[in-house]
Amino acid sequence: YVKLLCNAFSALTVFVLQTFRHGFPYQPTAVAFDPVQRLLAIGTKTGSLRILGRPGVDSHVKHEDNVAVIQIQFLINEGALVTATTDNSVHLWNFRQKKPEIVQSVKFQKEEITCIYLPLQSKWLYVGTKNGNVYYVNIETFVISGYIINWNKAIELCRKTHPGAVVHLCENPLDHSKLLIGFETGQLVLWDLCLKKAEHRWQTPEPLTSISWHYDGKQFVCSHTDGSLTYWSTRYLDKPNSINLPHAKTNKDGKLETCKPINKVEWRHLRSGDAFVIFSGGLPHDTAGRSPSITVMQGKNITVLEMEHNVVDFVTLCENPWNFDAPSPYAVVVVLQNDLVVLDLLTPGFPLFENPYPMDLHESPVTCCSYFADCPSDLIPAFYCVGSRGSQRRTGFSEKDWPLSGGEWSPTSCSYNEIILTGHADGSVKFWDASAGSLQVLYKLKTAKVFEKNHSRSMDGSDDEPYAVQLISLCPESRKLCIAGASSYVMLFKFRKLESISETCVLEIPIFLKFNGIFFLHFPKPGADYGLPVKVRSGVQKKPPGFQPFLVCLTSVVAGKKPVQITALSINSSYGLMAYGNENGIAVIDIVQKVCVLNVGTPDLYGACDPYMRVPRSPKCANPSSCDFTSENERCRSPSNDQVEIFFFFHIIHNKLDSTSSRSRSSSMSSLENINYEAVQCLAFADSYTKNVIVFHYLLIIEYYFTGSIFRLSGGILTMSFLDCNGALIPYSYEAWKDESRDKQKTPTKLASNSRMSPPPSGSTEMACDRQFVVIVSEKQARVVALPSHNCVYRQQLVENDFVVKSEIISLKDSVCLVCYISTGRVVAHSLPSLRPLIDIDFLPLADLSFQTRKPGIVDPMLSIWGQQMFVNEDTDQIARTFCFSNRGHGLYLCSPTELQKFTVSAEFSASLAEMMGELFFPHEMPEAPKQSFFVGLFGSGVRTLNREELFGETSSGRASRSLAKHIPRSSAQIEQLGQRASTAASEVSRAHQQVLEPENFSSSAHGLMLKYKDKKWYQL
């Protein structure tokens, strides 16, 4: 019979929310610094905004549209900042609360914004445009003043050409009524704001890139596109005081070398009188192999600091926020294309500060991710212990504290541990602690060291990423780790606290090759053109503490062919088995005795139900390995000796581009050659119940088939899980880890197997515990099948014309549910085992993850549509490897090549998220402005302030034309609320539709059950 199970879930239990973002901001474009709050803001090409403070203070927000950030200006010590974007908008952000929000915006309709400038303690923002005009925006009301500086009034009347875009705006430090305007062509204008006219004009010899004032207000420096610096005086001289080409040398012809542009320059002084001139670029063109650089000029000393990546922007960190006094610089923040570095200006040699943020996530491209929530509590200390011992402390860093010390870190974290594993293209695996709002690296495992370097060639002639990690399977309790690499190998690692010296066992598993529709078994033999893509280091090797290689399974490859990709991987430490599947079949390895116990080809998996009517040709089990260093204790633990029955479940995806598969694949694709393959997409270990039987041992000679029951679903299988009779996840068995260095003197005993995730059934459930459910989820639908009757008790069509990218059965609030990420960008959740819809929310467009698309196009125009479809499908598989769901409703995905984005589907965790987020704004007193001496004030050479409200206000200057810009007062929080309301409404409509279909499905299932048992006697039931 079918027992109807109550669902503990409701729609209020599940709520999708993005939580924390970690890594380096992808494609940065601008940077700014608040010297009082000591916060750093970085804008990106995609509209993201990261605000960084002390370690643990890291906030991410994003503009509504994917528009690049041009420039950022802090409202010093006010808890706000202004951003200018490429859609010609100016946004005011408020970060006095934990989650920054847009307060107001204004979008220019007829002008293109090129630069902005906000004077200290001013509410009027200066906006320069591509047409050469300057506007004034009130950041409190976002009203544009009628005071406008037009380009034709700023230049000389005799000038016949347009001066170009405004590239720089800055006030005179001592006279705020004088505005220095820098145009792209090199035209400089000192504008008198009170008199509304140009006080003086200069023309630089080369196009202009940036300007920086001396704090005395009497001179300034300009940087140019020819790599030169020009120094100017405000004493109405038409020529520069000096022209300096810092990196130009005289060649053999007696001429100066041509140099690259100096993109930005800053002129900063210490109170002692020493001056720093800091700029980026300016190196000679003909210097081969010259790296991007930052140059620091201190007096006659010139220091060139080479960078690993292109310099995007930099900002000098100063103690003094007042620009009319010596700013006292102490550090320089340099934003590179793929890194963030901070230079110590006060230490000889200008060493770097050691970066406390996880900015090296993309040190090697991320190829796969695994997320483990609620893992054993002793795992993080163990990883950190071996990681700290294995990594030598880097030298050459500044001994001073990290200069970005703003905000307050929240010590609140989850009551359970979270670990993230990232696999990389160079074969490394990084272990991260993600328990709190921050991300800290624990340990780095380099799998490429297991192989010989001189044999790391690809058999198809390419050398691209032979060690790239494609799949990761970790048993946290036993601390056994399986890694599948790009060169068709699988590695098993065991965790040990101490260094060891041993030999790594190697198994060469035979493969299948398909010729003219017939499968042949190939073993490497003399004269055959076979080979191994990689070769394991032979002999006894010294292995550092941590995960040490224990077993490597290799697959031989035909020369000129690509290695067969590993498509599924799983390990069960309790059984002592490791299983992996590829495009040709499946292999099961006894990891205790280091032998292949099962090697089955795809035809044998079908058995008599093979739709292609092929002759099964599977290899015999390989001979036991010659590795003799297995302990006696481990041998007695071998699953070959234990009487343990294993329920093995897998799915074969046949012809990934066939019309029977998902993603609207064309049926004509099956006529293309060399694209038909069958790959094991998913496999799982599970216990079956055998206690209510009587076992008789007979020796029968029968024809043996590997196959069992076959369940066919539309689309490839993505995940499977097993539920007990009460609908709870069946506990998976594991072997507890033990410290071999501590227990090696003890008497060997058989290790006890434990279980995790839920308690074993007892009491009243004992009679019903021989029943269980298997949940099978494909790219199109989900089914719940009762075992051992194999009746489909629940089914759900997840999508029609789209497909599921990633799905997982997770535990959430003492129950389980199915969570799926759909290709339409939506996240859907269903209760188990009833598959009742819980939520259907718009989450993330799949196009936002298209940066992982690396496949080239097809030249043949007749195949362009098919080929593009094929590559999209393969890239979707790569996206699925970096998209993870975990227990407790946690999840993450690779949102850019350099960043990880965490999210949650738990409403309970979403409610407590605010407590885990750090405070960005912390009240500080504004530093007192430097006092002027009596004689400076007497002779009128002190600071001249400006009443900007009187000058730019509506009463004196009026408002600009309404057609000039559009005011947008709505905050981002309001927009987010509207989006949530729309998603909630769509979810309610979907739930109502499902409630209509549920009675029909139940009626159909009941009718089918009645027909099945209608004509059977009572003893046949």
Please name every model-derived segment.
Residues 1-50, 59-62, 85:
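N-terminal alpha-helical scaffolding segments that mark the starts
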Residues 46-49, 87-90, 131-134, 185-188, ...:
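Short coil/turn segments within WD40 beta-propeller repeats
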Residues 23-32, 67-74, 110-118, 155-172, ...:
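Canonical WD40 repeat/beta-propeller blade segments in eukaryotic WD-repeat proteins
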Residues 6-17, 51-61, 89-105, 131-163, ...:
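Per-blade loop-tip surfaces of WD-repeat and WD-like beta-propellers in eukaryotic adaptors/scaffolds
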Residues 148-160, 243-258, 310, 357-397, ...:
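Surface-exposed loop and turn segments in beta-propeller and other repeat-based domains
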Residues 319-322, 342, 363-376, 382, ...:
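Intrinsically disordered, low-complexity regions in large eukaryotic scaffold subunits
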Residues 37-41, 59, 78-82, 102, ...:
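Structural hallmark of WD40 beta-propellers
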